[in-house]
Amino acid sequence: VDIAIVGTGYVGLVSGACFAEMGITVYCVDTNAQKIEALKSGVIPIYEPNLDHLVLRNIEAGRLRFSTDLREVLNEGDVIFTAVGTPPDEDGSADLSYVLEVARTIGRNMQGYKLIVTKSTVPVGTAEKVRATIAQELETRGVTIDFDVASNPEFLKEGNAIDDFMKPDRVVVGVDSDRAKELMTQLYRPMLLNNFRVLFMDIPSAEMTKYAANAMLATRISFMNDIANLCEKVGADVSMVRQGIGSDTRIGNKFLYPGCGYGGSCFPKDVKALIATAHQKGYEMQVLEAVERVNEKQKNILFEKLSSYYQGELKGRKI
């Protein structure tokens, strides 16, 4: 199965290189011509351990190719992954304009069956919007071509992304047809042969799983920061408390370290998007809204402690 991946950011490039390493011919597409020319030369725009070697090896093997035009590679394979950005709108919801623009391009140019797989982090219902967008373009063209949509969210940790892809805890795949399931099974066959868990489910559940996972991890971080602040008030040692609760196999040790709050490119955006999705459906995510409030407050605590320690005189201090 040959595939195209639209978007050569963190998710798209790591996914493309890893699929190529599994023996699949991958066409990575991005509208940024400068980035594509750099990638063709083996210049990687992001840092991820061993990614540069993986990209170069698969370029030389002819399995990893780059293009600025989705129309050129659209009909090279049956599966197209969407890994474009979904930045937050003003209300915190995910902006799907890039995802739907890819869908429009596919609908305008596809000549035969395609499986369109969303790898970007997107709200529940996005696959149906992609389906409707492609169907509208096909109707405008006056043609009838079969296609399927699917969801295959990524669960990559920065600094460990290649291992996370090649040796995953699980691979989540949302499909709603036997043909789509068979194609995704072919793609992930090496992982199935190595007994890695590939979890097939309905598409809305797959879309929700990504948000729920990140929201759960963000919740643990805010919870431990709240506990750390209380420990300080009552004279307890939060590191001892962390060991005590982390030793419980129902809880475990991961994401139990207090600090200055969660950040980065995923957790804040995804928590806001999940809260926004709930609001759109008339539901209040009380726990997640508290998680967000704790996190916003936590950002200031370190600076408040510094200011208190130096009695407000921070100018010229070496921290």
Where are these regions (language model features)?
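Structural/interface elements that position substrates and couple domains in central-metabolism enzymes
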Residues: 1-319
